[in-house]
Amino acid sequence: MMFGGYETIEAYEDELYREESSSELSVDSEVEFQLYSQVHYAQDLDNVIREEEHEDRNSGNSESFSSKPNQKNLIVLSDSEVIQLSDGSEVITLSDEDSIYRCERKNFRVHAKEKTQGSPASLHSNDLADKKCKRDIEKSKPGERSGTIQEVMIIEVSSSEEEESTISESDNVESWMLLGCEVDDKDDDILLNIVGCEKSVNEGEDDVNWFISDKDIEAQIGNKRSSGRWTHRYYTANKNVTCRNCDKCGHLSKNCPFPQKVRPCCLCSERGHLQYACPARFCLGCSLPMSSTHRCLERASWRKRCDRCDMIGHYADACPEIWRQYHLTTKPGPPKKPKTPSGQSTLVYCYNCGQEGHYGHECTERRMFNQTFPTSPFIYYYDDKYKIRERDQRIKRKVKELQKNGDLPRKFKRPHMEAADKRPRDIRTSHASWKNNRWPQEKKETQKETMSRNMREREKHRKAARCHEDDEDFPRGPRVHSTPGTSKTQKPHKPFHHSSHYLKPREDRLSKEGKRGKHKKKESCVGEDSNDNLFLIKQRKKKSKL
């Protein structure tokens, strides 16, 4: 019942295709060989099909055609010279009489109850020298009966091998076009039967229509050119690509003309050394900075067990759950707790083995990285402010013990941070921070320096006071007589070598020197009136003579 009442599929095919017998398989193999030997590659099939449909519609405007849509194609195969396709899209005609492989496809009208007349040899006797497959569309006559427009493909097979070899060379039929042939050196100059592209493969690279990705067009990445002068041009067109080596636009890091940068350290981000030679590396056991005399006093990590998450490799004060509990917190203070406890998801996968049913920290197979122990991704409980305060106090006590024993070295400073610290800042803030950031050993040295500075200042003040007393004992200028109306007394002039004179700014000094000149003029006027000071009078006479 599977084959419509026929015993075998061969009998069903014989009845379907109206063949007398299916014992001769040579005809089918020859047809298959000839069909596969003439393979045509199409590029723009949509445009070609639209053109054919448009031409079919134009030819159909002259007459009305009647066709049955549900009628199946009937293929007639026989040992005679004609093979017909009735009510189908194509008619294929094969013959073994002529000399070459030829192919023609024609659109013509096929009547419902007519047979094709004439031998296929007579149809192509005048076209033996053609090189390509031709497609001719013939318009039907207005007096013909109603039918359908179909295509006819006629393939003629040669009988002699010599004619086949000579004509195939003239028709550009290479050995690669035939099934079962090996690759030939002459296959470079191949003219493909490509619809929509009439260019050969071996044409220049500028003439080949290659397809370029849209991402490559947007990036506009240029290959590295052979000449060196092109790489140094500052007006290159490709400006939207940034180099990771020199941070300039226009090229990639592999095409950069500058030498490659040295790889930075993953611990301190400085260049010139790697992780194992870094001065800021830390101990994996105690997490303290390592030095030449460092000795780790902590227990091995596989002997540590956390009282908080019950995992191996750390203690409760270093549990990753401490920072994981802040996943909902956005303000300073204790961590925010969720209103409803989050349940575990139904889909559980392992990041270590990739299997379903368990998490990565529960996996019993070998780990990909053995330097650290796995941790739990869940939060068992949230800390309140009292527990946070207790943990901070424990950490401070531990830091004091390390400082007391000398196990905690000085803080490592990067070179760029040290250069930033050397910039001028406010004297008060720098002095306060300088006092607070010093260690006890350095405080003793600073105290000695401050004591010596204070002693020097005291000696300067003592010398200034002695000079002031000498001026009072031996006056060199006239004394100003105080008037009864003024209660203010003039202060004695300070000597020029006083220490406070150098500490004042320059503008104040200039203004005060100007005032001193005015006071001297007034004193000279007063001295002329009173003849008490004879020494000044003698000096004036000498100056006037000179």
Curated annotation (Swiss-Prot):
InterPro entries: TRAMP_AT-DNA-binding, Znf_CCHC, Znf_CCHC_sf. A zinc finger (CCHC-type) spans 241-258, 263-280, 304-321, 348-365. It comes from Bos taurus. The keyword Zinc-finger applies. Signal peptide: none annotated. The keyword Zinc-finger applies. Component of a nucleolar TRAMP-like complex, an ATP-dependent exosome regulatory complex consisting of a helicase (MTREX), an oligadenylate polymerase (TENT4B or TENT4A), and a substrate specific RNA-binding factor (ZCCHC7 or ZCCHC8). Several TRAMP-like complexes exist with specific compositions and are associated with nuclear, or nucleolar RNA exosomes. The gene is ZCCHC7. Residues 59-71, 430-439 have a biased composition (Polar residues). This is Zinc finger CCHC domain-containing protein 7. Keywords: Isopeptide bond, Metal-binding, Nucleus, Repeat, Ubl conjugation, Zinc, Zinc-finger. GO terms for molecular function: RNA binding; zinc ion binding. It is found in: Nucleus, Nucleolus. The lineage of its organism: Eukaryota, Metazoa, Chordata, Craniata, Vertebrata. Residues 402-429, 440-458, 504-514 have a biased composition (Basic and acidic residues). Its main location: nucleus. GO terms for biological process: nuclear mRNA surveillance of mRNA 3'-end processing; nuclear polyadenylation-dependent CUT catabolic process; nuclear polyadenylation-dependent rRNA catabolic process; nuclear polyadenylation-dependent snoRNA catabolic process; nuclear polyadenylation-dependent snRNA catabolic process; TRAMP-dependent tRNA surveillance pathway. Residues 52-71, 402-546 are annotated as: Disordered. There is a cross-link at residues 131, 139, 141, 239, 254, 339, 413, 435, 488, 491, 494, 538 (Glycyl lysine isopeptide (Lys-Gly) (interchain with G-Cter in SUMO2)). One of its GO terms (cellular component) is TRAMP complex. Residues 490-503 have a biased composition (Basic residues).
